[in-house]
Amino acid sequence: MYRAVTRRIEVTVEPNYLPERSSAENRQYFWSYTVVITNSGEETVKLRTRHWVITDASGRTQEVRGEGVVGEQPVLAPGERFEYTSGVPLPTASGFMAGRYQMETEAGEKFEIDVPPFSLDSPEGKRTLN
């Protein structure tokens, strides 16, 4: 599991290679990843936007930006957590992802929190992110 904490908001990520959705001969590899966001702070916050940087084993980088996550802009009161699962395809057998979420307090203050860099590994291309 990968973990980052910014302003007492913890983000953990657990990637999972999906061989049933992947094909080495077609150069299509697919992972799911489960993200848990836990608000250990004292303010209620809303997740506004996401920004992902996805890098494959060849060094090609793709950036993904958008509102919310999985169609939601969750609100987390102190002590609450939000969990979701999404997926990512790559044309190589390994890679990594990292990102940021823009959060907003009830007072309207916007700030960014880190999503920890995490490794996307498959049996065909084991690679570890240190």
UniProtKB/Swiss-Prot annotation:
This is Protein ApaG. One of its GO terms (biological process) is error-free translesion synthesis. It comes from Rhodopseudomonas palustris (strain TIE-1). Pfam families: DUF525 (PF04379). SUPFAM superfamilies: ApaG-like. HAMAP family: ApaG. Residues 3-127 form the ApaG domain.
